[in-house]
């Protein structure tokens, strides 16, 4: 097994390799003075890119430092000698691997092919040169780089021109021979060449004129811009010049795409408008049909119903398919026949109050009518207020501040049948009774017993009674007259009763007025 290279040999090899212009910048990012190397690719990297290569894994890239690591093997040195940034850049450009994504770049097929190529070249160099320090045939290079030598001016000036013309300007400089010939011009290489070969004396065999003529040719050939043309060290990874035609093509494509988007938006808007117009047309047709139906219903009405419907505008313009139409719901409210009279007309005549008017008849949906509970309450509290005849069929007295009952149209009152003939017998019989029973009303009691009971009830609130009052003397003055208010209720009760009736009448008038106004406002809006 061959011995490992020494530290001096490693430094000499990397000193010579890093002297190449393409190896003075990072292969990935172009940073100056890279001090790390990727052995599978033979390229030089900066410290940041070396960290990225470590994250890829050793199966893709193996990183070592060119300054700190001293355990390099001959195979690793051969990989760096046969590789280089220039050859790697040319290979990747040739195979289209110009992406800036490191992960995608080194996982590509091109990177795999280049790794295999570097491995084959390194194995060939190992088998051919063994442990020789250089693989280009120049064995007069540095053997002891630590020893300082004086520079030979004549050797620098009379160097054979073939060494500079080994690679023409038009030939690709991706081989190792180009790298070797480019690095000979450095002072360190010149010193190493003169270490064993000695100073050159060829200058003595040439004329001064020829020597002077050689100098400008060397300088001119040294300044040939071959590196800028073939190596592309400052161009990055596959950068290409963008022409004005590419910009115009991109602009044209963008304009075409914009026109397509505008056409699509216009088509969508047109479809939405058409659907909206069709739906509005259908809705208008439905409204016309509903309106015609309402007009037909209005024409079928007669008399004042039609006038009221036209005045209120009920059901003539339905706003939607579910609009409410009062025209279809108008009907005559028939008057209920009262079962019994709740109060006596003669008793109400005693209350001369302007707020009492004859109100409308009792309807089924009238929330303000005086029901049986109201009259029964006064029948139990008053002394003789409940002596009215329940068989009398008469309209109920209600409070209304809007329109008197006598002013209401006659077509509102349609009794179900002819009222039964009134009978004054029950009224005259129970006129002075405070309370009666069904047996008393239908005559199932004895007349004498009834008269005695009625007298006792009549005299129960008196301070003093006489025999005429008790036995019913017909000559008595206080029993010979008609019904008086004193016989019905005491004076104090009459006063309280009047005040209560006035307050209730006022409240009922206000409530009835508000309800009627709200109903008119509501129904007139249709």
Swiss-Prot record:
Membrane topology listed for this record: Peripheral membrane protein
InterPro entries: ARFGAP/RecO (IPR037278), ArfGAP_dom (IPR001164), ArfGAP_dom_sf (IPR038508)
Cell compartments where the protein resides: Cytoplasm; Golgi apparatus membrane
One Gene Ontology cellular component annotation held by this UniProt entry: Golgi membrane
Pfam families the UniProt entry points to: ArfGap
Coiled-coil regions, chain positions: 247-314
Domain Arf-GAP, chain residue ranges per copy: 11-127
Keywords, sorted A to Z: Coiled coil, Cytoplasm, ER-Golgi transport, Golgi apparatus, GTPase activation, Membrane, Metal-binding, Protein transport, Transport, Zinc, Zinc-finger
Zn finger residue spans: C4-type: 26-49
Region (Required for interaction with coatomer): 97-526
GO molecular function, one term: GTPase activator activity
SUPFAM superfamilies on file: ArfGap/RecO-like zinc finger
Keyword flag Coiled coil: yes
Residues spanning the membrane: none
Amino acid composition bias (Basic and acidic residues), ranges on this chain: 405-416
Residue spans of biased composition, Low complexity class: 165-180
Primary residence: cytoplasm
BP terms from Gene Ontology: protein transport; vesicle-mediated transport
Disordered: region residues: 159-180, 354-426
Function: GTPase-activating protein (GAP) for ADP ribosylation factor 1 (ARF1). Implicated in coatomer-mediated protein transport between the Golgi complex and the endoplasmic reticulum. Hydrolysis of ARF1-bound GTP may lead to dissociation of coatomer from Golgi-derived membranes to allow fusion with target membranes.
Subunit structure: Interacts with the coatomer complex. Interacts with the C-terminal appendage domain of COPG1.
Protein name per the record: ADP-ribosylation factor GTPase-activating protein 2
Taxonomic lineage: Eukaryota, Metazoa, Chordata, Craniata, Vertebrata
Gene name as annotated: arfgap2
């Amino acid at each position: 097994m061959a011995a490992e290279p020494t530290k001096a040999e490693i430094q000499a090899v990397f000193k010579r390799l890093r002297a190449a212009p393409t190896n003075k910048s990072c292969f990935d990012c172009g940073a100056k003075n890279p001090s790390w190397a990727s052995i599978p690719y033979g390229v030089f990297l900066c410290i940041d890119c070396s960290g990225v290569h470590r994250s890829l894994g050793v199966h893709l890239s193996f990183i070592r430092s060119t300054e700190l690591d001293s355990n390099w093997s001959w195979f690793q040195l051969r990989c760096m000698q046969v590789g280089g940034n220039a050859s790697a850049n040319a290979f990747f450009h040739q195979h289209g691997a110009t992406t800036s994504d490191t992960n995608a770049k080194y996982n590509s097929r091109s990177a795999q092919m280049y790794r295999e190529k570097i491995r084959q070249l390194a194995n060939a160099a190992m088998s051919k040169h063994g442990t020789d320090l250089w693989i280009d045939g120049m064995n007069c290079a540095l053997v002891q780089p630590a020893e300082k030598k004086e520079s030979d001016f004549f050797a620098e000036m009379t160097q054979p021109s073939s060494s500079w013309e080994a690679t023409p300007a038009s030939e690709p400089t991706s081989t190792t021979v180009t790298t070797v010939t480019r690095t000979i011009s450095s002072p360190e290489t010149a010193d190493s060449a003169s270490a064993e070969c000695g100073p050159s004396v060829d200058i003595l065999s040439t004329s001064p004129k020829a020597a002077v003529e050689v100098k400008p040719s060397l300088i001119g050939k040294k300044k040939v811009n071959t590196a800028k043309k073939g190596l592309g060290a400052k161009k990055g990874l596959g950068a290409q010049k963008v022409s004005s035609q590419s910009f115009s093509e991109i602009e044209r494509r963008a304009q075409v795409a914009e026109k397509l988007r505008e056409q699509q938006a216009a088509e969508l808007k047109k479809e939405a408008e058409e659907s909206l117009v069709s739906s509005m047309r259908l809705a208008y047709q439905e409204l016309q049909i509903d309106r015609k139906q309402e007009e037909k219903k209005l024409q079928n009405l007669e008399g004042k119903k039609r006038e009221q419907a036209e005045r209120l505008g009920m059901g003539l313009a339905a706003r939607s398919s579910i609009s409410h139409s009062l025209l279809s719901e108008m009907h005559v409210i028939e008057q209920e026949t009262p079962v019994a009279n709740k109060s006596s007309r003669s008793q109400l005549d005693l209350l001369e109050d302007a707020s009492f008017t004859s109100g409308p008849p009792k309807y089924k949906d009238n929330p303000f009518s005086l029901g049986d509970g109201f009259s029964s309450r006064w029948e139990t509290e008053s002394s003789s207020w409940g002596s009215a005849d329940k068989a009398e069929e008469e309209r109920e007295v209600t409070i209304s501040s809007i329109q008197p009952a006598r002013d209401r149209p006659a077509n509102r009152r349609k009794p179900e049948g002819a009222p039964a003939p009134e009978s004054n017998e029950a009224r005259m019989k129970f006129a002075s009774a405070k309370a009666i029973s069904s047996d008393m009303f239908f005559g199932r009691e004895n007349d004498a017993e009834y008269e005695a009971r009625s007298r006792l009830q009549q005299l129960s609130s008196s301070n003093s009674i006489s025999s005429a009052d008790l036995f019913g003397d017909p000559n008595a003055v206080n029993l010979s007259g008609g019904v008086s208010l004193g016989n019905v209720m005491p004076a104090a009760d009459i006063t309280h009763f009047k005040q209560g009736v006035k307050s209730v009448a006022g409240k009922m008038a206000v409530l009835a007025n508000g309800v009627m106004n709200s109903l008119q406002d509501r129904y007139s809006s249709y």
